[in-house]
């Protein structure tokens, strides 16, 4: 079932792109993707930012507790791979081609193309360079790897120690028990396959354009266009398919070792060919700046820069509101004073940073990393059997971050150094108001040097990188190295290609395992199917818009949103699994959870002490429908049982039901009066809080472990099932009281 659901999503996406291109000369899907991306940034930046920080605090706490000594596997299990092979595999899987695409390009962008970016205090160009390196490390550091490690630890502890199949549904086994074997598990696995494929295709979309540029640089006859890139995708897919067919130890392990070694050689070469001490100084300084500012920037939601959008068509994109029920603030101001407002004017007036920084960079990155989490997390868990929780945190979280910092700092510093050298040689003036330069005045046109001075400087191997194409920048920084330049360009080509292959084969491998419900050796035709599906999705993403990258970014952010919630539950699941492994008293004394959970309508489970004559599926469905439109009956039954007071229970139920009816009425009238929708959702939140409080007391009476945050979330998302669930539990509270 999970394979079918995921296939419908992925091939449906491919079909939608093809139909859109066929029917419209100017395809509509890219606009829709961009609107979704903007909508998520406007409404859910806080969630992306906060969850990453909470996950990091949780994992850091685990490292210094007794749980760090628990093995991912039985107590006598030994690691299957050497430390170097293990690190090479997880790093090659976790990073992909992004290093080569962004290694030089991102620091240059933040240095000369990001406008008045204000993540750190900037008063001179040295601090601007420092901020550029920091912002790059921020996007590739702790917050990036944390989703991987949460999923990896959860799967490793639950599956390796409990002998469950290695599939994403079982990461939630400590929460919902054998519900993972039913439809709920199918949905989790289908979501994981879809997120994995979209996440991997984000990297493949970036990587294929990079490979195309390197080939064109080495051979001028190679065209840089979509046709060439389509061919590259399918050639790489063929190689990746062979790797998947060979399996984990013969195929993926060998390719990962080779890929990581190529990157290591390239890093050593640029270090010894350039000013070694400058690069080491830059690394040490960058780590210090990162440690100083990562907490403040890690909680930065761009609140005031995003507020500027309210002065520009009221959070609208292509004429559609991004905040439901909110009228345009700019329209009100214009009606009052006759003065037009805009986000651009607000940015200038209040000296704000660019509002697109969040959805264009930070939220894109968080969505990208999160969409990779089921894929990389499962892969790390798969190869980490026999290692302890503490060893995995150190080796699969801290170590790759440190290596990433070395690579990004070295290449980013070389890029900024070349930018400054070219600015000095061409006597380019920097506009201190937004730290930018005029490429045309500097002798560049169409990303190519055109003036005599710029051409002569390029012949010596130096370019104004901010005036160059993003794909060319990592090649440009190697241009000054004389006879080694071509060799290093070949290394870049090989490195990108094989990072592309390792990402593709690892993604197909994980999709294959999930769809086979954890089976170690699924049929070869199934492996080929997922590799082909991945390639088709990557091609669809690439062709969805002329720029390609904007659509790729949007899909990454959209795919990451639902999995953000899933990873939050992975933290709870991991915590419970670890406590049960050590048989902590507080958790062993309580019931496993609401066995009649919000999924009961689908899985037909019953309370653990319910007699054989349990309600039929028809009765349960009827109970859910009644709770959906008239929650009073279920709430009254549950509240009276939980509080052991008929009057108080009835009052609670009446107040909650009146709140629900008022919410529903305001919701129906939301299009009539301004602010009605806001009042409606405020009332709904009040109703949810009342349901959650009753659920909390029902759990306490039934000795069911959980927490109030989960009570709130369940009540908010599926209140009819929660009410029905409590109504079914209530009689057994009465039985215990009578006993």
What would you call each of these model-derived segments?
Residues 1, 40-46, 75-93, 121-144, ...:
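Transmembrane-helix boundary/entry motifs in multi-pass membrane transporters
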Residues 1-128, 572-578:
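N-terminal alpha-helical transmembrane segments of multi-pass membrane transport
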Residues 14-22, 91-111, 144-166, 188-220, ...:
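Hydrophobic transmembrane alpha-helices that form the core helical bundles
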Residues 19-44, 210-228, 246-257, 275-282, ...:
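Membrane-lumen (extracellular) interface motif
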Residues 21, 29-41, 62-79, 131-139, ...:
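Membrane-water interface regions at transmembrane-helix termini and the short interhelical loops
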Residues 28-37, 64-83, 108-135, 157-183, ...:
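Flexible loop linkers connecting adjacent transmembrane helices
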Residues 180-495, 519-521, 541-548:
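Membrane-embedded translocation segments of transport machinery
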Residues 588-739:
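Intracellular leaflet-associated regions of eukaryotic membrane-associated proteins
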